[in-house]
Amino acid sequence: MNKKLLLAAGLALMSAAASAQEVKFYNTGRKWNSSFDALLNGNSIHRVTRKGAETVSPETNLQLQVTTIVGGAETVADFAIAEGYQAEAPTDQLAVITAPASFIKTLAARSEVLYVNKSEQLFPTMHLVRNETGVTKVTEGAGLDTPYDGTGVVVGVIDQGFEFKHPAFLNACKKWGSSATSGMLKNSAPFNDPNDNEGHATHVANIAVGRKVEGCNYYGVATGAELLPMMSNLSTSSTIAQAAAIKKYAEGEGKPWVINMSFGSNSGPHDGSSDTDQNMDKLSTKGGILVGAMGNSGAEKLHVMHKFTEDGEKAFFYIKLDDQLNTNSVVYSEVWSANEGEGLLTIRPAVLSRGKLCYPTAVQMNAAGQTFEAEVSPFNNRQYGKFSGYFKQLLTKMGLNTGEFVWEVEGKAGAECHAWLNTDLAAGAFAKTKLTLDDKVYTTPEGDGNYATGAGAASIPSSISVASYNNATSFTSLSGNSYSYASFVGEVADISNFSSRGPSLSTDPKALPTPTIAAPGGVVISAFSKKAKSFSTDATENVQKVTSGGTPFYYGVMSGTSMATPVVTGIIALWLQANPELTSDDVAAILQKTARKDSYTGRNLTWSKEWGYGKIDAYEGLKEAIRMRPDGVNQTLNSVAPVTLQKGNDAWKVLFNNDESYANVRVIAANGQVAYAQHVVAPQHGDELVVNTQTLAPGVYVFQVSTTASTVTRKMIVK
């Protein structure tokens, strides 16, 4: 066996047990994505990336996502390995294979294979947390005081930009991801993360599980959880394989798990139906939760929609590119039908030049390196059109000096379509303008930020999708200067300006709403990676420097739903420690019941496209998680960690973690007098006792809870 085969066999593959959830698939008559056609015909294409144009030849290795019949993925992966290619089977219906386009027809000919798709690129969703959510430092004498710290729970973080040696992660890991493109694990930390551009992963992982570092107050939510860091190139093929690896490892250890996904994109149907979303959904299970960032497109005009009232009606969507941020004039946009079926829409890319619409031919688009797909998706039976490329090159091939991109969509009565601009790759906006065509005036719609659920993470049907609000808008840097980000993030306590809005276009009644919940994501201080390409010791965002082992390490400010998501991930880790059998539906029910409402969310909020169910509350959610715990699970009579305390200004709440024979709760004044006493007979897990502190005189007290096995004593300050 040659080295290539040895490598493939080494990477090989785990295959998840067959899931009860079968991938929804429609036979459209095609066995592969139409974007492969040019390659299969022997032509090279140009792919849009953040680094610029990338030429792809028929022999360039691609990350392929191969959908199979139930139970067929492992067989297909083994076949690819035998042919000398790298392959994995993250689920029983998906094989991810690294191979050139020339291998696609060979794969498609196999009886197990339903469809060969391309991998999509995802992006980090980055654009004072603990107190705000009810998780705070006990030493401050306020907030949540609980024995639950995530111990026994695996927190997987799939991301880019880990500084593995940061003291925030000291003794936090037993395994590490060893490849940015697969689910391989290793027993030691990699030397560095090849995709560390901004230190994103370091910031994110510390929010979720960062350890306490001497001299630093910026530690994580679940400080006892086990971190499994998976450095990733964030292609959908990679993230699926890495999520499956986290699940396999945690379940092999007999531990519940939660995966943080602070990434996404504005590609796809935004309905949770893609092969990525459906197969990620298969991983979700009892004691296994996926958490995804909504995205940072809330302030962008990246979405438009149109409902057709008569056959033959036309709609036009005009894209105004940002000349300063999009100097290469990249267009990356999609139009999707909201209705199942073929022939409801005719989708055409066009160029508006000197008041006329010009339609590029396939020859012109190919010559300019553009990619245009127009087909019916086999995963939701909906038509779509997708255009990507460098627009100025297209103008040249069309013989035009000037022009702007326009979608032309013709529909049948009752049809509805949505269009999105992928602003991660193509800065711009859908803009309002007037078009006069054949003596008829059309007004193109101005874009909005609706229906912008991040693809590949928040869009997964069972994912807990997270919006961002602001717990802070300013900070003081290492230099001692104060800075305000209010113009960017918005007002304190309000939804962050950048936080992407829902809802999803899903028609699946079992899919969770997007967003599901909101957490602090604006101006969050967490660990920085000094190995990031963008890092500077003089950066304004640096807030604190600590020294560990003679080496300096840093903490600083980032904002985004990327930062809000690990807050929720860490809190769910606490809940999983208390109740390791929680499902995603259980977590969603807890969030729906316990989310905080205020004047910003609306006090009568049930759900909204901005907030989901409201602001996450760690304590109230923990109470519900304990109450939902089935008999016989993690219940210890007369335990040594009997209670969780929620310390408020007006009252202290005593939550019983387990069943106890009895409990005595006392508040003792400095002079030794008992100011409050309550005997509780046989409290059960999830029971709560509220001690009103407003009846106490200002001063320092001892708060004491005694049970058969232990006594918990805390200092109480009443002002």
Specify the residue positions occupied by each region the protein language model found:
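Catalytic-core environment of secreted peptidases
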Residues: 174, 182-186, 352-353, 371, ...
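Glycine-centered tight-turn motifs at strand-turn-strand junctions
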Residues: 650, 674-695, 709-712
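Active-site core segment of subtilase-fold serine proteases
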Residues: 146-149, 160-202, 206, 253, ...
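C-terminal tail/sorting-segment detector
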Residues: 20, 654, 677, 698-719
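Hydrolase catalytic cores
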Residues: 205-208, 228-235, 247-255, 332-350, ...
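Subtilisin-like serine protease catalytic core
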Residues: 142-239, 254-257, 272, 285-289, ...
